[in-house]
């Protein structure tokens, strides 16, 4: 289902006034007609002047050039900010005894509620177990722990909005809900940020500090940033159980991580091996995720500035190097390479065995062009003879393909690039210690001096860049720890295939199955200081060269010493142990989160009660690297799937469809949308970050373009509602601030509706129980039926977890049913004295039930308004709407009247026709009389029952019925509703044809110009044919209406004034 079009909140109807009872045939509405009489001379002259000015404006617009898009952009006007200024201590209930402010103000509404919710314990499952509507069922979720590397972005806000809506709905239903908060230590990201900050503020590098001193700096930074993230979660209204908050580096998590490592090792699923891996420098460390790698396509020669390198480096080039044939001075094999800096690590040259150019050299030796040592020329079917010269250098220590080839031929790798990105001692003194790209230039220079450089040429290529450091990715050989994933992966794939694990949307199943069918072992070692240090110890002892190191694993050094004593047969006290300095991949601890957050490995009450989790909701980009690993480790370590259902939401993009990125300057901070931010504030935040000056200038310019007037204050509820209005079934979510701003207008509409309702109820109003309320008229019955339908649609949306169904139903009820129809319909009834008892009771039920339906999505606004409603007698009210019962469709089913709704939609069609006629003849203030004529008896009876609402809704005067077959009145505009229904509107005395005809001609000319331009223009590539045709049809229809209106006006000029008007 398409998401709710929040960008356009124009109501289809102005409103509907109430019709008391069923009028007799030919009966009319009794409202006054102040504008139905002929226009006075003074008013006529003023109106003619305004119309002449308007006509001149129209003609100027038609003749002049259209404005550029930039000129049409208007700055948002800041709304009046109302503050809650009643002294209230944090945790005390907000004072709602005073009147509502005249307009919705997010800061006023959102003040004081959250601390009170937390202090009262509404978010704790222990409280929910005591609710009257308690079901005895449990519902548990954990928040995807955000990285402590900074503030939450709009993607986090989407996660919170969806999860909190589901959590609040389950809580109001009566389930015992546990939603666990937490944050992730984010090893690589956090260490990089802190290192950058240390250098920026203190001029200190990490290695100039001890490991302990550096970790103290990280912990201090975490405490500052972690608190900021918690405050953002509170501002978003996340109903988390803060007493159960956890952090992936706290004591409980550390115990769980160590236990998991030990158990996996004992199960034979953890091992240590020397393998090639992708590394980044500054400092060089093992990369853990594919999205830390940006594959940048290069069309040819491209210069890049890299961290730590003094000059720009050229890429997209193929260097040709000659390898002399040993024993033949004039013979050589030319090899093409994009990485001449790895030449010192070459151990062979390979050719295809069937390449006739090199058949005579099979088995021969070549001379290394730099080092001079002999290299074998080997044959391998992996070589592509038609690429380059058909000969390739083999560097097993720095290329995955070369590593496989070297293994096939028994070639030993040579590590020539160190972990800090410099050249190793194996390269010789002349290269050792040089930055690898500085060494490149020196190597090419030496090759040229020796006459072995054969030139370079442009070479399109894809260059892997680290998205964090901006450096080129290197492949290095190192001994590290690996998790065997084949067996666990097969179980994860089988869980989805069997239906034990449900992925939604279901199209993600294909990626899941493909990934697990091709899964390799998982490298969990990271060369960092920040993180869980690996609980593995090297037994330091003398052993013969070539023997493998002896490693032991233990929950503590004492336990590891006992294991080492058993392995070596020596007393543990005599053994020297060195703990592995590396830390575990951040994903390792994150993969344990669903059960470590509940106390595992201890058998805690929370673990027994809330594990497995009821649902995992997260971004689709985390499906494999987080969700997949949670399933693998959860099943292995606990014997059960960590959850049975996974709900995946799309990635948030900007309104242009671009990924939100700091480098693009289009990242939206939820706080800026909630509270608003001027352009100066947005720019100052950029300057306070860690961007380098060149990048800062680009980002600042992009930000000014996207938000030229800053960001308006929209509030938390508007942001949450907007995010939830986008369905999860489609592609990426493209979000614009204007969409959220439109939803703020929707909040204001609800606010004004409750102000009206509270005023209408008065202080002495006593609500009836909902089950005793029965409608006393058609309009009451209609709105209660729509309310019951809304409750049913909301339940369907929550059960299917398609929140766009919920937002659509609520938006339609509050705006189009309640505000635009029923509230207008009930106004004349409420003015009667004495006021009938039915409408106030209906108003109360709409407010009470409507707010409870809304509460999971707009918790602050719903609480603020619901607290001001009078309680129903006979049952103690819930202290908060957050723990009040969610409306059940079953309990409201007796209000459903689908046939009445269908019939009333016919009335709304008449209103649309009347409103179109008013717009065509520009009857802005006049209240023309209306006649309806139908040849169908059913329509006649329907219209007779709704004469007053028809007049009110269409802003017309008296509405009457014209008998079937009767002649059309003279001087009245006519419009068909259908083949059987005609609508007539009085024009005589209300419209001056001499003024209106030129205006219609100007409007027609403008529309004709648009139509001609559209027909002459060649459709752009990708433009939908149906959209173009719809636009053409719309313009042609409008032109037809104008022509018909002009014909009516000319006829009105030719006809003498009617001696009398039809009797209504």
Swiss-Prot record:
Reaction it catalyzes: tRNA(Val) + L-valine + ATP = L-valyl-tRNA(Val) + AMP + diphosphate
Transit sequence range: 1-26
Enzyme class name: ligase
Major subcellular site: mitochondrion
Keywords of the record: Aminoacyl-tRNA synthetase, ATP-binding, Ligase, Mitochondrion, Nucleotide-binding, Protein biosynthesis, Transit peptide
UniProt-listed Enzyme Commission number(s): 6.1.1.9
A Pfam family the protein falls into: tRNA-synt_1
GO biological processes: valyl-tRNA aminoacylation
Single GO cellular component term: cytosol
Record-annotated membrane-spanning stretches: none
Compartments where located: Mitochondrion
Motif window: 'HIGH' region: 146-156
Domain of life from the UniProt record: Eukaryota
Biased composition (Basic and acidic residues): 42-56
CDD domains the record matches: Anticodon_Ia_Val, ValRS_core
Positions of ATP binding: 662
Cited InterPro entries: aa-tRNA-synth_I_CS, aa-tRNA-synth_Ia, Anticodon_Ia_Val, M/V/L/I-tRNA-synth_anticd-bd, Rossmann-like_a/b/a_fold, tRNAsynth_Ia_anticodon-bd, Val/Leu/Ile-tRNA-synth_edit, Valyl-tRNA_ligase
Motif ('KMSKS' region): 659-663
Coiled-coil ranges per UniProt: none
Region (Disordered) residue spans: 25-65
GO molecular function: aminoacyl-tRNA deacylase activity; ATP binding; valine-tRNA ligase activity
Function field: Catalyzes the attachment of valine to tRNA(Val) in a two-step reaction: valine is first activated by ATP to form Val-AMP and then transferred to the acceptor end of tRNA(Val).
Annotated family: Belongs to the class-I aminoacyl-tRNA synthetase family.
Protein name, per record: Valine--tRNA ligase, mitochondrial
Organism taxonomic ancestry: Eukaryota, Metazoa, Chordata, Craniata, Vertebrata
């Amino acid at each position: 289902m398409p998401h709710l079009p929040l960008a356009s909140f124009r109501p289809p109807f102005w409103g509907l006034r109430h019709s008391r009872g069923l009028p007799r045939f030919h009966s009319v509405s009794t409202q006054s007609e102040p504008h139905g009489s002929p226009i006075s001379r003074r008013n006529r002259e003023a109106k003619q002047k305004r119309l002449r000015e308007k006509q001149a404006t129209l003609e100027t617009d038609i003749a002049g050039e259209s404005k550029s898009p930039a000129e049409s952009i208007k700055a948002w006007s800041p709304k009046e900010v109302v503050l809650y200024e009643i002294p209230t201590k944090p945790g005390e209930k907000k004072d709602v005894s005073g009147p509502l402010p005249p307009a919705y103000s997010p800061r006023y509404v959102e003040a004081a509620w959250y601390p009170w919710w937390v202090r009262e314990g509404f978010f704790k499952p222990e409280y929910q177990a005591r609710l009257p509507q308690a079901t005895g069922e449990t519902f548990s979720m954990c928040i995807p722990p955000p990285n402590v590397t900074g503030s939450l972005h709009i993607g986090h806000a989407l996660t919170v909005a969806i999860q909190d809506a589901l959590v609040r709905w389950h809580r109001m239903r009566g389930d015992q809900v546990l939603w666990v908060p937490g944050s992730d230590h984010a090893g690589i990201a956090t260490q990089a940020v802190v290192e950058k900050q240390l250098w920026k503020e203190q001029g200190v590098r990490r290695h100039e500090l001890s490991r302990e001193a550096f970790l103290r700096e990280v912990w201090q930074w975490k405490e500052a940033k972690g608190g900021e993230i918690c405050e953002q979660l509170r501002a978003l209204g996340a109903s988390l159980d803060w007493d159960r908050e956890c952090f992936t580096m706290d004591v409980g998590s550390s115990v769980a991580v160590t236990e998991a490592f030990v158990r996996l090792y004992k199960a034979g699923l953890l091992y240590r091996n020397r393998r090639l891996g992708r590394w980044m420098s500054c400092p060089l460390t093992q990369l853990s995720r594919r999205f830390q790698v940006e594959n940048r396509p290069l069309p040819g020669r491209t210069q890049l500035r890299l961290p730590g390198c003094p000059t720009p480096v050229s890429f997209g080039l193929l260097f040709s190097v000659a390898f002399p044939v040993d024993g033949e001075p004039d013979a050589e094999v030319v090899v093409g390479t994009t990485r001449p800096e790895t030449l010192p690590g070459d151990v062979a040259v390979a050719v295809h065995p069937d390449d006739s150019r090199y058949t005579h050299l099979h088995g021969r030796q070549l001379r290394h062009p730099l080092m001079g040592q002999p290299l074998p020329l080997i044959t391998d079917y992996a070589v592509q003879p038609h690429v380059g010269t058909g000969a390739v250098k083999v560097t097993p220590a720095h290329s995955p393909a070369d590593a496989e080839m070297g293994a096939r031929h028994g070639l030993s790798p040579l590590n020539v690039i160190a972990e800090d990105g410099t050249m190793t001692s194996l390269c010789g003194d002349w290269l050792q210690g040089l930055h690898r790209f500085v060494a490149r230039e020196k190597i090419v220079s030496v090759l040229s001096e020796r006459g072995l450089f054969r030139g370079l040429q442009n070479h399109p290529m894809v260059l892997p860049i680290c998205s964090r450091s901006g450096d080129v990715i290197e492949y290095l050989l190192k001994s590290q720890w690996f998790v065997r994933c084949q067996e666990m992966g097969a179980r994860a794939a089988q869980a989805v295939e069997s239906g034990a694990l449900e992925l939604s949307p279901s199209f993600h199943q294909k990626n899941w199955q493909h990934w697990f069918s091709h899964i390799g072992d998982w490298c969990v070692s990271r060369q960092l200081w920040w993180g869980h240090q690996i609980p593995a110890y090297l037994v330091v002892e003398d052993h013969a060269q070539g023997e493998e190191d002896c490693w032991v694993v233990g929950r503590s050094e004492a336990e590891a010493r006992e294991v080492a004593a058993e392995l070596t047969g020596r007393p543990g006290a005599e053994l020297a142990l060195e703990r592995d300095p590396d830390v575990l991949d951040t994903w390792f601890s994150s993969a344990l989160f669903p059960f470590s957050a509940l106390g595992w490995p201890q058998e805690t009450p929370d673990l027994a009660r809330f594990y497995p989790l009821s649902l995992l909701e997260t971004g689709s980009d985390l499906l494999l690297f987080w969700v997949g690993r949670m399933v693998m480790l959860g099943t292995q370590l606990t014997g059960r799937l960590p959850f049975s259902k996974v709900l995946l939401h799309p990635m948030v993009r900007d309104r242009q469809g671009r990924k939100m990125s700091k480098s693009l300057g289009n990242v939206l901070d939820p706080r800026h949308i909630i509270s608003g931010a001027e352009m100066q504030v947005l720019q100052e935040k950029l300057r306070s970050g860690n961007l380098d000056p060149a990048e800062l200038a680009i980002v600042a310019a992009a930000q000014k373009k996207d938000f030229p007037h800053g960001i308006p204050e929209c509030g938390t509820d508007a942001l949450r509602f907007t995010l939830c209005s986008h369905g999860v079934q489609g592609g990426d979510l493209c979000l614009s601030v204007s969409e959220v701003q439109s939803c703020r207008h929707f909040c204001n509409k609800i606010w004004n509706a409750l102000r009206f309702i509270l005023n209408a109820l008065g202080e002495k109003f006593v609500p009836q129980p909902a089950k005793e309320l029965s409608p006393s008229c058609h309009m009451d019955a209609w709105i209660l039926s729509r309310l019951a339908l809304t409750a049913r649609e909301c339940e369907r949306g929550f059960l299917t977890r398609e929140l766009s169904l919920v937002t659509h139903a609520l938006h339609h009820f509050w705006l189009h049913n309640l505000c635009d129809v029923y509230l207008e319909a009930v106004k004349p009834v409420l003015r009667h004295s004495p006021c009938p008892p039915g409408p106030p009771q209906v108003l109360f039920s709409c407010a009470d039930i409507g707010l409870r339906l809304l509460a999971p999505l707009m918790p602050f606004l719903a609480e603020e308004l619901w607290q001001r409603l009078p309680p129903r007698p006979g049952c103690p009210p819930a202290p908060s709407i957050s723990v009040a019962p969610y409306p059940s469709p079953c309990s409201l089913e007796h209000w459903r009247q689908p046939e009445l709704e269908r019939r009333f939609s016919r009335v709304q069609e008449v209103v649309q026709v009347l409103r179109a006629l008013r717009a065509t003849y520009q009857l802005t203030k006049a209240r023309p009389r209306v006649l309806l004529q139908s040849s169908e008896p059913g329509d006649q009876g329907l219209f007779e029952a709704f004469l007053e609402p028809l007049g009110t809704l269409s802003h017309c005067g008296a509405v009457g019925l014209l008998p079937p077959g009767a002649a059309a009145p003279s001087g009245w505009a006519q419009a068909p509703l259908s083949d059987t229904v005609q609508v007539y509107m009085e024009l005589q005395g209300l419209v001056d044809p001499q003024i209106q005809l030129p205006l219609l001609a100007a409007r027609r000319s403008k529309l004709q110009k648009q139509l001609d331009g559209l027909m002459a223009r060649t459709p752009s590539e990708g433009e939908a044919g149906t959209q173009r045709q719809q636009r053409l049809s719309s313009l042609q229809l409008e032109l037809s209406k104008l022509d018909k209106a002009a014909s009516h006006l000319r006829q009105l000029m030719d006809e003498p004034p009617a001696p009398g008007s039809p009797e209504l």
